[in-house]
Structures are given as structure tokens and as C-alpha cells.
């Protein structure tokens, strides 16, 4: 959700129980403005909160003028002091794949994992147990990246792509019409397209290049991983991810108000294919 309209956005997302105490709201309003100024971001998003056993991680993201350029991610434990996280890598994803369970809420906490490594001694080769330590900060970076790639979404028309390949906020976007808000095809993943590149020219013929340049939720796997509900007498549409429980997207039809927020434990629902 956009930090510039934080209070309204939190109100729209409150139907899912994603609320903040008054003092946290006040701290966020002030500190995110300072983050935007100090880091010279074009936009700042309040991404959400990852619940830990000892403390919670409050997450914010900074965007440049090109909305699909790599984002800067920051975390805070008190909504006042923000620390910049390193970019996510494939190596990080491999490292944290062996870690499960809840976050502790301490970035310096280290998880211990025992793995077998082959050791050569002369002509003999044998397996030796090695204890590998993985920092919670590394896990935090990778989980945020995974959630972003899988379930961060925007409504169709919220962004547009220039002929030069740069993506900007669409200032003329006035919201989705009521006839379109219940369709998964009206929502796009907020990342570079992956599936779109595999479509044939015939399939792309009906698409508007300046608007339909992202992957639609329509073909997400597994099918049925999104729940769509109309709330407040059709004045609000809410999408919830069943794959990453805690991700809520909201949009007030025929208005510019939309956004998403994640409030959860940072654990993926691996059983979803068997539950559908």
C-alpha cells in the first residue's frame, strides 16, 4: 500500500484484520516520509508485517520512477528506525529452503542446519556432518522476494509501459468498472512478465501493449489459489491469497484506491494443492 495514503489504505484493508495500533500508525506516517526523502524514492510502499515469536518485522519498499525496476526493501522493529536489506539472490533461496517454522524477530538470530559433505582423504571418500548457520536476515530477504514474485498484484491499467520500455504509474487510472472487478484477468502480478513471453502472436493479438504487459492472475497455478470477495455493499473488492496466507489485496472500484498488504508468519501453504 502506498505510504502517501497510508491511513485510508489501512482502513480499506482492515476487513481482513490487518490493523495497526494508533502509535504504530503515527510512527509509520512520519518515518516513511523520511525514508522517501532520505533515499530519494519516487514512491514508498508499506509492504506489511512478518510476525515473529519475539518481535515483528515491519517491511517497507522504495520504488524508482520505473515501477518494475528492482525495489529497495527496508525493515524496522519499531516503525521508526529503518534498515536496508540486501537484494535477494538464488543462493539465498537455496540456503533458506532447509529452514522451516516461525521467524524469531531477531535479524542476528542464526538457524543451524546439519548437512552431509563429501570429504577426500587420500584415496578414501567419506561423508562428514557439517553444521551450516543461516542468518534470519537472509531468510527475511528471501521470503519477501518469494512473496513479491508470487502474490504482489495490481489492477489492470494501474501502470502503463512507454514505447521505450519504461513502466510508469498511470495518472489517468480511475479504477476498475464493477463489471470487471470479479475477474482474475483484471489483476496482474507486480513484477516482470514470465508467462506472457510464452504466448503465441495469436494470443497476444487482443492485448493492449501499453497496459497488458504483465502476467494475469487468470492462469496462476494452482488454480483456485485466490479468493475474491465483494465487501461494503460492492464498494470494495478484496482478493486473498491462499498460497501465502496473510496477503490481502483491496480495491475500491471506480476509484484510484488500491494496494496490498501482507500480515503473516512468512510461511507458504504447501498443502494448498491437496486442499482445493
Curated annotation (Swiss-Prot):
One of its GO terms (cellular component) is axoneme. The keyword GTP-binding does not apply. Disruption phenotype: RNAi-mediated depletion in the ependymal cilia results in a near complete central pair apparatus loss and alters the ciliary beat pattern from planar to rotational. Multiple radial spokes proteins, including those in the head, are markedly down-regulated in the cilia. The keyword DNA-binding does not apply. GO terms for biological process: axonemal central apparatus assembly; axoneme assembly; cilium movement; epithelial cilium movement involved in extracellular fluid movement; flagellated sperm motility; mating; radial spoke assembly. Keywords: Cell projection, Cilium, Cilium biogenesis/degradation, Cytoplasm, Cytoskeleton, Flagellum. It comes from the Eukaryota. It is found in: Cytoplasm, Cytoskeleton, Cilium axoneme; Cytoplasm, Cytoskeleton, Flagellum axoneme; Cell projection, Kinocilium. Belongs to the flagellar radial spoke RSP9 family. Functions as part of axonemal radial spoke complexes that play an important part in the motility of sperm and cilia. Essential for both the radial spoke head assembly and the central pair microtubule stability in ependymal motile cilia. Required for motility of olfactory and neural cilia and for the structural integrity of ciliary axonemes in both 9+0 and 9+2 motile cilia. Component of the axonemal radial spoke 1 (RS1) and 2 (RS2) complexes, at least composed of spoke head proteins RSPH1, RSPH3, RSPH9 and the cilia-specific component RSPH4A or sperm-specific component RSPH6A, spoke stalk proteins RSPH14, DNAJB13, DYDC1, ROPN1L and NME5, and the RS1 complex-specific anchor protein IQUB. Interacts with IQUB. Interacts with RSPH3B. Interacts with RSPH4A. Interacts with RSPH6A. Interacts with CFAP61. Interacts with LRRC23. This is Radial spoke head protein 9 homolog. It comes from Mus musculus.
